[in-house]
Amino acid sequence: MNITQIIEKLKQNEVVAYPTEAVFGLGCNPFSQSAVEKLLILKQRPREKGLILVAPKLDYFFSFIDKEQINSQHWQKLQQTYPRPITWIVPAKKDIAKFLCGNFNSIAIRVSQHPAIKILCEQTGFALTSTSANLSGIAPCKTSDEVRLQFGADFPVLDMSVGSATKPSEIRDLFTNQLVRQG
């Protein structure tokens, strides 16, 4: 599908596949419980685990993160450019929907410069949920053709290339810098 069709699907609270820095991600509108529920069912992902949000700028995350708990050093860390993609675990707003953060009082966010993420967020006006495009036990998809093989020929997938990263993003706690997932 082209970018316009994918944007329409996202606005209609559908789940789509789009390229990220290393693999294809499955994403949807994080403000829509029905969209997130579809994503969790499709991915067979336990609700308790929570989801990652991606966007080209921090502003897209302000509806989800507790800005009061983040000091100037933490903001610098979030705004810094790194040689590889880093997902940060940050404090979530107290009223955040549990379908996004699972059993946690935090949420994972990643500022991404991938052109697809930039265009999709700018055109929809929201961050995207991001979980790797693969069924349980199968390697994440690196091409749109692989997505169609796993999820069906009619699955809405953006026909663009993934970035140059060879591994999915590492995940770190913003406050402790503890490595949660190796990238």
UniProtKB/Swiss-Prot annotation:
GO cellular component entries: cytoplasm
Pfam families registered for this protein in UniProt: Sua5_yciO_yrdC (PF01300)
Source organism superkingdom: Bacteria
Span of domain YrdC-like: 1-183
UniProt-listed InterPro entries: DHBP_synth_RibB-like_a/b_dom, Sua5-like_dom, TC-AMP_synthase, TC-AMP_synthase_SUA5
UniProt keyword terms in alphabetical order: ATP-binding, Cytoplasm, Nucleotide-binding, Nucleotidyltransferase, Transferase, tRNA processing
Matching SUPFAM superfamilies: YrdC/RibB
GO molecular function, one term: ATP binding
EC number: 2.7.7.87
Broad enzyme group: transferase
Reactions this protein catalyses: L-threonine + hydrogencarbonate + ATP = L-threonylcarbamoyladenylate + diphosphate + H2O
Locations listed in the record: Cytoplasm
GO biological process: regulation of translational fidelity; tRNA threonylcarbamoyladenosine modification
Chief localisation class: cytoplasm
Family: Belongs to the SUA5 family. TsaC subfamily.
Alphabetical list of HAMAP family matching this protein: TsaC
Function of the protein: Required for the formation of a threonylcarbamoyl group on adenosine at position 37 (t(6)A37) in tRNAs that read codons beginning with adenine. Catalyzes the conversion of L-threonine, HCO(3)(-)/CO(2) and ATP to give threonylcarbamoyl-AMP (TC-AMP) as the acyladenylate intermediate, with the release of diphosphate.
Stated name of the protein: Threonylcarbamoyl-AMP synthase
